[in-house]
Amino acid sequence: MPYKAFISYSHAADGNLAPAIQYALHRIAKPWYRLRSMRIFRDQTNLSASPGLWSSIESALRDSEFFLFMASPTAAQSIWVQKEVDWWLSNRSAQSFLIILTEGELAWDNTLQDFDWSITTALPHRLSKAFTEEPLYIDLR
């Protein structure tokens, strides 16, 4: 796959943090002779002018090994982010869906084996029952 990961985020909430995450991932264990250690897709660095925005995004999703979701209440409400999440869950395993919590709340209910939606604000409800066990996530709040 051309991309190791696809970064899904809200420009309003994480427009400054997403480029930093991409930059850091490019630099992890980078051999001196390579430009980057892995290719990471982020809309503002990998998309060019095109008559079909969604088809370009869908192509990048198809070509990505992991989905990095920068979780925030703003991202959870974003129509574009929800489309990306829907595509990933319909075409890939939740095992390759990684969560980076940037703001808001995320809570797991061990009894229900699902997120506690009365507390969780940073995830779209489409993730209800998507995971078979509590996901380990990175908390950057």
Predicted regions and their residues:
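Short catalytic/ligand-binding loop motif for oxyanion handling, primarily in non-cytosolic enzymes
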Residues: 14-16, 76-79, 105-111
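Flexible, active-site-adjacent loop/turn segments at secondary-structure boundaries
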Residues: 45, 51, 78-79, 136
